[in-house]
């Protein structure tokens, strides 16, 4: 373990503070061998492309087609919450209530439950951030209270084994089935759940489907995408790997299934009833272990309001006061020009269908202009929501992108420099490039940076420092409160020119131009790099020299990329 001391500004106090972080930086250099002892190879990845290996999403859909719902000897219906921690417009929860009401007609003693399953090994393997986990735990407590008003108990199950075990294992299947049997007293249970599109999660669901029997029936639903993966294809029936034509088809699809003149998406709303006659609220006994929080400065814990109502309120405020300025302000580093909804979307506290519905009402019923360049601010906001769908669609079609591999397999030949000292300086905001350092320090202190910030720092790491983009992708996942694997991998692939619909390899962000364009008065930089407050264009002695010369490092990157591609 290496101790790194970072000097940075404090966003919530006027004076400079120091932050001690004890951190193992080597964990970002590769997949965790404890969980992935045999990582996928280029050959293995190509098996998905040449169809010699079935894609997990295809397997899930194939298994589900064989299913038939039976209420015989069933006493319990249960919704399994995952990244959908909400009541309003939740497809799986809505279906669970509908199945329960059907079951009640046959069995008056039937029960309706909800469950959330904790597997700390999944969190470790997937590098979920402490910021995000704190938000999730707060959201679960709030969700439990909301469900209590409906007399629906929310159970919290913890999966532990003597050895490190992911949820896509036979041990988890046995654990899950046993837990369900305990709740239903040995009778049948119907489980509803919304699909998660990462490869590990899909293989977990495949194992469960392959092991279901008359005592356990599983029903999986598409929920996190406005348009489910696989429904948008080219005229030849293939999957899009470029966003713009996909987006135009996405808009066409959404418009074709428009619910009404005021709502473009169908929402799934459950009735506010008392679903169980007897009900007892049992507080959770789980506390987040310190290992997930030790690299976060406790004095800086300032989480957003975790409630579902807060998400809805934030959407209303954004559309009412800020969305009209979105085009001009979303990239500015010193302004809060974004919606602030990303953590609510990632954890499922708000549905993207609801977001698009509300935004649709603000743009005269047109979610896209005839010419994309003429998109209004609100239309471009909707387009950003569509990007999330796009990256999920891509992850389903190219599953190896959630297995530590780039979409463009030829970029595996790039000869990265992978300087560990330079990587640590990038992580801790000590590169000597003010805009990069300000962004990275803000990430450490708050768990959030906007999309422009992510693009700037990703370009600098992969192009100017020539460090494998996957190191940075893992760092972001471990530190972002809104970390979403498909969007994170997609964004890093774009900036490093290794991914889907990526920028050309010869496009390298100029850090000076980025700073002048998105922080022209150095308001943001001076907030997070206080060493520069009184520098008067001179580099202060207590601020590091640049790790690289921007011009020379750009030329080096072009040569290395060209040699590989």
UniProtKB/Swiss-Prot annotation:
Record's InterPro entries? Crypto/Photolyase_FAD-like_sf, Crypto/Photolyase_N_sf, Cryptochr/Photolyase_FAD-bd, Cryptochrome/DNA_photolyase_1, DNA_photolyase_1_CS_C, DNA_photolyase_N, Rossmann-like_a/b/a_fold
Keyword DNA-binding listed: yes
Q: Where does DNA bind?
A: 514
Pfam families, A to Z: DNA_photolyase, FAD_binding_7
Q: What are the annotated GO cellular component locations?
A: cytoplasm; mitochondrion; nucleus
Give the first-level EC class, as a single word.
lyase
Q: Which residues form the signal peptide?
A: none
Q: Which Gene Ontology terms cover its molecular function?
A: deoxyribodipyrimidine photo-lyase activity; DNA binding; FAD binding; mRNA binding
* SUPFAM superfamilies noted in UniProt: Cryptochrome/photolyase FAD-binding domain (SSF48173), Cryptochrome/photolyase, N-terminal domain (SSF52425)
According to its UniProt entry, one GO biological process term is: photoreactive repair
What keywords are assigned to this protein?
Chromophore, DNA damage, DNA repair, DNA-binding, FAD, Flavoprotein, Lyase, Mitochondrion, Nucleotide-binding, Nucleus, Transit peptide
What name has this protein been given in UniProt?
A: Deoxyribodipyrimidine photo-lyase, mitochondrial
> Which species is this UniProt entry from?
Saccharomyces cerevisiae (strain ATCC 204508 / S288c) (Baker's yeast)
């Amino acid at each position: 373990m290496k101790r790194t001391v970072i000097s940075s500004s404090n966003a919530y106090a006027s004076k400079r503070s120091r932050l001690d972080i004890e951190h193992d930086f080597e964990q970002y250099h590769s997949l965790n061998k404890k969980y992935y002892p045999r990582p996928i190879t280029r050959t293995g990845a190509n098996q998905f492309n040449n169809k010699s290996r079935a894609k997990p999403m295809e397997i899930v859909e194939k298994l589900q087609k064989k299913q038939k719902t039976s209420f015989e000897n069933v006493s319990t219906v249960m919704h399994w919450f995952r990244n959908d921690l909400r009541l309003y417009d939740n497809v799986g929860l809505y279906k669970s209530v509908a199945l329960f009401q059907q079951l009640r007609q046959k069995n008056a003693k039937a029960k309706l439950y909800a469950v959330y399953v904790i597997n700390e090994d999944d969190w470790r393997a997937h590098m979920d951030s402490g910021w995000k986990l704190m938000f999730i735990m707060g959201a679960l407590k709030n969700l439990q209270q909301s469900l209590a008003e409906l007399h629906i108990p929310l159970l919290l199950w913890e999966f532990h084994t003597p050895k490190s075990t992911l949820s896509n294992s036979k041990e988890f299947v046995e654990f899950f089935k046993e837990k369900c049997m305990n709740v239903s007293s040995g009778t049948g249970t119907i489980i509803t759940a919304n699909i998660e599109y990462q490869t590990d999660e899909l293989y977990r669901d495949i194992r469960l489907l392959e092991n279901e029997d008359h005592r356990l029936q599983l029903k999986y639903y598409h929920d996190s995408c406005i348009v489910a993966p696989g429904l948008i294809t080219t005229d030849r029936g293939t999957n899009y790997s470029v966003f713009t034509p996909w987006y135009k088809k996405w808009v066409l699809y959404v418009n074709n299934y428009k619910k009404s003149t005021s709502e473009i998406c169908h929402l799934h709303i459950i009735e506010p009833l008392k679903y169980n006659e007897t009900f007892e609220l049992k507080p959770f006994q789980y506390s987040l272990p310190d290992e997930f929080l030790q690299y976060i400065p406790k004095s800086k814990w300032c989480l957003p309001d975790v409630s579902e109502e807060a998400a809805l309120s934030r959407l209303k405020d954004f559309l009412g006061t800020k969305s009209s300025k979105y085009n001009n302000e979303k990239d500015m580093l010193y302004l809060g020009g974004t919606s602030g909804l990303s953590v609510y979307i990632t954890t499922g506290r708000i549905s993207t269908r609801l977001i698009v519905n509300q935004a649709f009402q603000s743009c005269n019923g047109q979610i896209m202009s005839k010419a994309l360049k003429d998109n209004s601010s609100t239309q471009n906001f909707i387009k950003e929501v569509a990007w999330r769908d796009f990256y999920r669609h891509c992850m389903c079609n190219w599953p190896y992108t959630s297995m530590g591999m780039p979409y463009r397999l030829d970029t595996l030949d790039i000869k990265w420099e992978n300087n560990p000292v330079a990587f640590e300086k990038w992580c801790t905001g000590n590169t000597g490039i003010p805009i990069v350092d300000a962004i990275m320090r803000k990430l450490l202190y708050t768990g959030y940076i906007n999309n422009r910030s992510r693009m700037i720092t990703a370009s600098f790491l992969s192009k100017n420092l020539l460090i494998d983009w996957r190191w940075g992708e893992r760092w972001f996942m471990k530190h972002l409160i809104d970390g979403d694997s498909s969007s994170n991998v997609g964004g890093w692939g774009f900036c490093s020119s290794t991914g889907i619909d990526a920028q050309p390899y010869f496009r390298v962000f100029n850090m000076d131009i980025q700073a002048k364009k998105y922080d022209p008065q150095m308001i943001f930089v001076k907030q997070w790099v206080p060493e520069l407050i009184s520098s008067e264009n001179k580099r202060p002695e207590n601020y590091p020299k640049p790790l690289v010369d921007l011009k020379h490092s750009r030329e080096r990157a072009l040569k290395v990329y060209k040699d590989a591609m």
